[in-house]
Amino acid sequence: VHFRGSTAVESPYHERHFEFARIMKEQGVECFDYELAWNKFDLEYYKYAVKDLFDRLDEWEFDGIFGTDLVAIECMNEVIRRHKKVPKDVKCVAYDGTYITQIVEPSVTAIVQPIKELAKEAARLICELVNGKTYKNEKVTLGVSVRKGRTTME
């Protein structure tokens, strides 16, 4: 299951989702995309979305979850509530890789974004804009890393 942001708006985050889907397809992995609502980031909404997904897929037709940190953790919680095991029955991988993926049990495998570097680049670009520099379709790409947790390995 691939939790993705809303396609109702144009956003650079679509690139990571399209690339994820392409690579999974290339590897012969079938994905079910669950599209999250635009601009909804609260835990209650994530709980609703995860429950909605699990209710729709009442048969265990999936063995993995890929979503933001909070979505992946809520999926892990729902798997456990339904008396299944992580990672034996369902593996969970988060993207963002904030500290919360390390303080839950089991710790969540995460694609870690370089938050400090993202903040520095954002501040640099804002300062340059304030000082009169103009950009057209400026794109900054920073590398990510994988931090292995216990949600993908037994």
Report each predicted region and the residues it spans:
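Flexible loop/turn connectors
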Residues: F54-E154
